[in-house]
Amino acid sequence: MATPAQLGLMDAASPVMEEMIYFHDHVMLVLILITCLIFYSMLVLISSKYIYRFLTDGHVIETVWTVIPAIILVVVALPSLKLLYLTDELDNPQLTIKSVGHQWYWSYEYTDYYDIEFDSYMLPLGDLSKGDARLLEVDNRVVLPVDTSVRVLVTAADVIHSWTVPSLGLKMDAVPGRLNQLALQCSRVGTFYGQCSEICGANHSFMPIVIEAVPVEVFEGWCDMMLDEESLGSLNMKR
């Protein structure tokens, strides 16, 4: 959800997002120090009464302003590389779900331990309850166990979409005919919202993503409920 004045990042709900916030703060500190140094140098040069018009080169200062920026780039690049590899790290996931983008909704499949499939459509304004988020609520949420390593397979059935949940630090393109994967781990219980982040047609703005992180025992109960509903639906179709 939006932060005060919409200036800060969302509260982290996953280890990856926490690392992204740390990296953001690290880079911002470096940028602020560089900016202050440049403004200070400009102020000193402008206000100085001493001008030497015949200075053509200075080997020492040229060496300094070559070496120092190189060191700064290394200081910025090393945490960036660490974070880049961390986002791609996927070690023995305990649960795998598949997310398929359609015009203009998402469908999900839980195929590891359960045979659960459902579509997730945005709730129209007339169906919202008090306190629901406008243009972000869906009829079927993605329910995941907290503190569990989850692999998400992302693809699309028609055009390119993008499966994005900012609070979890997730963004992956959904490309027709291709399976992309990302690692997900919710570090706290809560409801986290996202949207399709790739323009995909007229109703691109109406493809929300809602992830509900719950304790493991609650997740198991939800799976049993979904299986019962699917079994009941199959019986009704046979009749």
Curated annotation (Swiss-Prot):
GO-annotated molecular function: copper ion binding; cytochrome-c oxidase activity
GO biological process, alphabetically ordered: ATP synthesis coupled electron transport
Free-text comment on the cofactor: Binds a dinuclear copper A center per subunit.
EC number of this enzyme: 7.1.1.9
InterPro entries the UniProt entry points to: CcO_II, CcO_II-like_C, CcO_II_C, Copper_CuA, Cupredoxin, Cyt_c_oxidase_su2, Cyt_c_oxidase_su2_TM_dom, Cyt_c_oxidase_su2_TM_sf
PROSITE patterns recorded: COX2, COX2_CUA, COX2_TM
Main location per the UniProt record: mitochondrion
Intracellular or extracellular location(s): Mitochondrion inner membrane
Enzyme class, spelled out: translocase
Keyword Zinc: no
Record topology, Mitochondrial matrix segments: 49-62
Segments on the Mitochondrial intermembrane side according to the record's topology features: 1-26, 83-239
Residues where Mg(2+) binds: 198
Record NCBIfam families: CoxB
Main function: Component of the cytochrome c oxidase, the last enzyme in the mitochondrial electron transport chain which drives oxidative phosphorylation. The respiratory chain contains 3 multisubunit complexes succinate dehydrogenase (complex II, CII), ubiquinol-cytochrome c oxidoreductase (cytochrome b-c1 complex, complex III, CIII) and cytochrome c oxidase (complex IV, CIV), that cooperate to transfer electrons derived from NADH and succinate to molecular oxygen, creating an electrochemical gradient over the inner membrane that drives transmembrane transport and the ATP synthase.
Family: Belongs to the cytochrome c oxidase subunit 2 family.
Protein known as: Cytochrome c oxidase subunit 2
Species: Branchiostoma lanceolatum
Primary gene name: COII
